[in-house]
Amino acid sequence: MAKKVEKLVKLQIPAGKATPAPPVGPALGQAGINIMGFTKEFNARTADQAGMIIPVVISVYEDKSFDFITKTPPAAVLLKKAAGVEKGSGTPNKTKVATVTRAQVQEIAETKMPDLNAANIEAAMRMIEGTARSMGFTVTD
C-alpha cells in the first residue's frame, strides 16, 4: 500500500546552500524530518543551479520518511538576473527600473514552462511579462 502523506512543507532555499539553520531547520524539525538528510540531498540535487532560489515541496509521510520536488526558480528572480538589477521598483506604475527584451522573456518562459499553468509558450510569455511590469520593468521588442 502507498505511504500516506502526513504533511507538505513548502520552502524557497538558495540552491546548494540548505543548512540546518533557520528558516530550513525549524520548518523541517516541526515536520519531524531528518534535517541533515534533507540538506545533503537538496544541496546535491541543486549544486548545478548555484545562486538561484529554488522552491521545494517536501512530502512528509506518516513514518517520518520524506521526498521532495524541486521547482524552477521564481519568475521574479529570473527577471532580476536577466535585467541585471538587485530589486524591482517600489512604485512600478511610476518608476521603471529596468528593461527586458521579448527574447529574454521567451527564454524565461521556456525555463518556467513546466511549473506554469499555461497551454502554450505565448501564454507563458504573457504571464512573465505581467510579472515584469509589476516589478517596474519595461518589456521591449
Curated annotation (Swiss-Prot):
In terms of InterPro entries, this protein maps to: Ribosomal_uL11, Ribosomal_uL11_bac-typ, Ribosomal_uL11_C, Ribosomal_uL11_C_sf, Ribosomal_uL11_CS, Ribosomal_uL11_N, Ribosomal_uL11_N_sf
Gene Ontology CC terms: cytosolic large ribosomal subunit
- Report any one BP term from Gene Ontology: translation
Q: Which PROSITE patterns does the entry mention?
A: RIBOSOMAL_L11 (PS00359)
Question: Which keywords describe this protein according to UniProt?
Answer: Methylation, Ribonucleoprotein, Ribosomal protein, RNA-binding, rRNA-binding
PTM = One or more lysine residues are methylated.
GO terms (molecular function) for this protein are:
large ribosomal subunit rRNA binding; structural constituent of ribosome
Xref: Pfam families: Ribosomal_L11, Ribosomal_L11_N
- Is the RNA-binding keyword given for this protein? yes
Q: Which PANTHER family match?
A: 60S RIBOSOMAL PROTEIN L12, LARGE RIBOSOMAL SUBUNIT PROTEIN UL11M
In UniProt terms, what function does this protein have?
Forms part of the ribosomal stalk which helps the ribosome interact with GTP-bound translation factors.
Q: Which family does it belong to?
A: Belongs to the universal ribosomal protein uL11 family.
Q: Spell out the NCBIfam families in the cross-references.
A: L11_bact
On subunit structure and binding partners, the annotation says: Part of the ribosomal stalk of the 50S ribosomal subunit. Interacts with L10 and the large rRNA to form the base of the stalk. L10 forms an elongated spine to which L12 dimers bind in a sequential fashion forming a multimeric L10(L12)X complex.
Q: What is this protein called?
A: Large ribosomal subunit protein uL11
Species this protein is from: Streptococcus equi subsp. zooepidemicus (strain MGCS10565)
UniProt lists the gene as rplK
